[in-house]
């Protein structure tokens, strides 16, 4: 597998661990001392606003499992990435990607069955987040791991 494809695979595994809220899978993608910084990208003063930071593989794994909002029954999220810009220099790489997160909620099937004429997917898909991921990766024993991740959201956050 080429280095470019290998670092793309790290991003693909990242978004899947995010969608599943799988802390173990998420943690396995990061170096032990990795950092995640999360910003609101469009603050009125033009400067990104820091809204969160995680330090260390274990903290990142724990946050994925315990701090991300769980999916409701019949619910899911889909973290779609696009527009990847990849730079590889030896055992270091940078991946800059656009993202959009959708929340998916399937309708409950009525006890009497779907109404006459109902066809296709039953439920809603709503965009809830958008922004950019910048991953700095390092190759360790032949495996690409995330050393730092910057998440820049295009929408403000309330906690």
List the predicted regions and their residue ranges:
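Short, low-complexity N-terminal intrinsically disordered segments enriched in polar/charged residues
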Residues: 1-32
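A beta-strand edge to alpha-helix "cap/lid" segment located at domain peripheries
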Residues: 69-159
């Amino acid at each position: 597998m080429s280095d470019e494809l290998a670092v793309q695979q790290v991003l693909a595994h990242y978004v899947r661990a995010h969608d599943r809220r799988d802390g173990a899978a998420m943690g396995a993608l990061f170096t032990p001392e990795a950092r995640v910084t999360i910003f609101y990208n469009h603050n009125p003063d033009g400067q990104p606003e820091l809204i969160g930071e995680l330090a260390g593989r274990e903290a990142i794994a724990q946050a994925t499992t315990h701090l991300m909002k769980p999916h409701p029954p019949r619910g899911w999220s889909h973290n779609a990435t696009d527009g990847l810009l990849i730079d590889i220099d030896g055992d270091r790489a940078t991946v800059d990607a656009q993202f959009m997160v959708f929340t998916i909620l399937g309708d409950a099937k009525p006890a009497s069955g779907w109404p006459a004429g109902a066809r296709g997917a039953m439920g809603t898909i709503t965009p809830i987040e958008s922004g950019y991921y910048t991953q700095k990766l390092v190759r360790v024993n032949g495996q690409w791991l995330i050393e730092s991740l910057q998440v820049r959201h295009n929408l403000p956050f309330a906690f």
